[in-house]
From Swiss-Prot:
Organism, as annotated: Schizosaccharomyces pombe (strain 972 / ATCC 24843) (Fission yeast)
Keyword Mitochondrion part of the UniProt annotation: yes
PANTHER family attached to this UniProt entry: ACETYLTRANSFERASE, GNAT FAMILY, N-ACETYLTRANSFERASE ACA1
Single GO molecular function: azetidine-2-carboxylic acid acetyltransferase activity
Class of enzymatic activity (EC top level): transferase
Temperature dependency: Optimum temperature is 20 degrees Celsius.
pH dependence comment: Optimum pH is 8.5-9 for azetidine-2-carboxylate.
Name of the featured protein: N-acetyltransferase aca1
Keywords tagged on the record: Acyltransferase, Cytoplasm, Mitochondrion, Transferase
Entry-linked SUPFAM superfamilies: Acyl-CoA N-acyltransferases (Nat)
N-acetyltransferase domain mapped to chain residues: 26-202
Residues that hold CoA according to the record: 128-133
Subunit and interaction comment: Homodimer.
Function: N-acetyltransferase involved in oxidative stress resistance. Acetylates the toxic proline metabolism intermediate (S)-1-pyrroline-5-carboxylate (P5C), or more likely its spontaneously forming tautomer glutamate-5-semialdehyde (GSA) into N-acetyl-GSA for arginine synthesis in the mitochondria. P5C has been shown to increase the levels of reactive oxygen species (ROS) in the cell by inhibiting the function of the respiratory chain in the mitochondria. The enzyme is able to reduce intracellular ROS levels under P5C-induced oxidative stress and protects cells from damage by oxidative stress.
Length: 209
């Protein structure tokens, strides 16, 4: 697998922002605040109880391992459509107010199947309904194959998560299976089904055509 830090940032298509890959080795100015913001994002989603199977909020150390052990891509706004991607080592970014969203990329299986990745997506609670999730999804299709993954599997897309289902199917993800009674979600009686989605990344040569 390729070092995520060597992959060029991806410019968002719908607003002025860049998606940048980071991991535990990335030099980020005020990285602790970035981690704190990511921790807030995931714990907010856990508390909502609608999209992640996790039901216990993460500590700072758990979140650090969750986000930085392999790779997380962060979405950072810039002033204009001609602004370059910020240098994370030197840029003074107020992560609490500026971080638009993020997603992790990691192997979905060990060993002989580690070329198949999984991703989890988070949009800032204060920046929702602005198309950020759609841009994160497209950034995922950019970064994952460049890291070296051949395909992606999402293990649990709950049947109640209509926006997510529409997004992945619009991007030609294949519904590979259904898990009956997969989750106990807040606001729903009984159990909710979940879908498994898979996507085969085109070769980088084909993607650049």
């Amino acid at each position: 697998m390729k070092d995520p830090n060597t992959i060029p940032p991806w410019r968002c298509t719908d607003f002025n922002a860049w998606c940048i890959a980071v991991d535990k080795s990335t030099n980020v100015k005020n990285k602790e605040e970035l981690l704190s913001t990511l921790t807030y994002f995931i714990n907010y989603e856990i508390e909502m109880g609608q999209t992640y199977p996790i039901d216990i909020k993460m500590t700072r150390n758990e979140a650090e391992d969750f986000f930085f052990k392999f790779c997380t891509v962060i979405c950072v706004p810039v002033e204009s459509e001609t602004s370059p991607a910020p240098d994370l080592a030197t840029a003074s970014i107020d992560w609490k107010t500026s971080l638009l969203g993020a997603f992790y990329i990691k192997p979905n299986y060990p060993g002989r199947c580690s070329h198949i990745c999984n991703g989890g997506f988070l949009v800032s609670p204060s920046h929702r309904s602005k198309g950020i999730g759609r841009n994160l999804a497209n950034a995922y299709l950019y970064f994952a194959p460049r890291i070296g993954f051949k395909s992606s599997v999402f293990n649990l897309v709950f049947a109640t998560n209509i926006k997510s289902i529409r997004l992945w199917e619009r991007l030609n993800f294949t519904r590979a299976g259904i898990i009956k009674d997969a989750g106990r979600l807040k606001g729903h009686e009984g159990y909710v089904d979940a879908y498994i989605y898979q996507y085969h990344f085109p070769s980088l040569e084909d993607a650049l055509k």
